[in-house]
Amino acid sequence: MPRFPHPAPENLRRDARPLLGRTALVTGASRRDGIGYAVARRLAAYGAGVYLHHHVPHDAAQPWGADPEGPEGVAAGVREARTDPAAVVAHGPGDLTDPTAPAELVATAIAALGTGRLDILVANHALSGHDGALDRIDVAMLDAHWATDTRSVILLVQAYARLRAALPARPPGGRVLMLTSGQDLAGGMPGEMAYALAKGALASATRTLATSLADLAVTVNTVNPGPVDTGYLDGEAHDAVAARFPSGRWGMPDDPARLLTWLATDEARWVTGQVIDSEGGFRRG
């Protein structure tokens, strides 16, 4: 006989609010077209309080621009998804290339959420553009992507881990979720060398971070969302990418959000140290 019995029937039924009472920080949640917003909405729908980090100057400098309703409009959309009226949804800015910003952001989020702890960290932010192929990249490009896409994430995880370690007990539900890209699949990303290197570092660090945080009852996983329609392509280029999916459509922000939010629940408590591709069968070849 197994030492641990099978769950009772009532424990097999899915809870409609599996994250009730828990808190989350989602970085890079500054546009309603983005993955961060989709993740934040699902976290709120699952019962969690959510702090949204944004860096509007980055979006404003991109071809797609900043969200027309600004950070408060983004936060309002997340509040609409709440299933716990008492759950806090707050937001604030931060330039995570500043080495002091990650720890400050974690502390700010904890204060805003009001529970004295942070359960779920979703490192969704990334630098877009400012990149090129091997023969075009320079030191500034490499440093910019390293600072934003890799260093800031590790510093966020460090600050989160230190605060979890300081808690009087080991509360369940500790989660670190990172996002990578398709840099390790098929032909890689030769036109985005700096980005691929920086995101590849997160994929490589996933298992090491999972081992480092295991004694704090924290799981660590990374998701490659594949091509997601966040408004950065249109016309023939958009159609060409869509044709490479078996479904004939791009991934939508809520597609990876479903996986990321599930990984934050207790159903995923036995999953850690994994890099998961969520690409809808995208054909890279």
Question: How would you label these PLM feature ranges?
Answer:
Residues 2-116, 129-132, 136:
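Short-chain dehydrogenase/reductase
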Residues 4-14, 239, 243-244, 261, ...:
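Short C-terminal tail/terminal secondary-structure segment
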Residues 28, 32, 168-201, 206-215, ...:
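Catalytic loop of short-chain dehydrogenase/reductase
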Residues 64-72, 126-143, 162, 166-172, ...:
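Conserved mid-core segment of classical short-chain dehydrogenase/reductases
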Residues 110-111, 148-171, 210-211, 215, ...:
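Amphipathic alpha-helical dimer-interface segment in Rossmann-like NAD(P)H-dependent oxidoreductases
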Residues 117-118, 203, 213-228, 271-278:
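Conserved Rossmann-fold SDR core element
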Residues 135-157, 177, 202, 247:
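Catalytic Tyr-X3-Lys loop
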Residues 245-256, 267:
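A conserved structural motif in NAD(P)-dependent oxidoreductases
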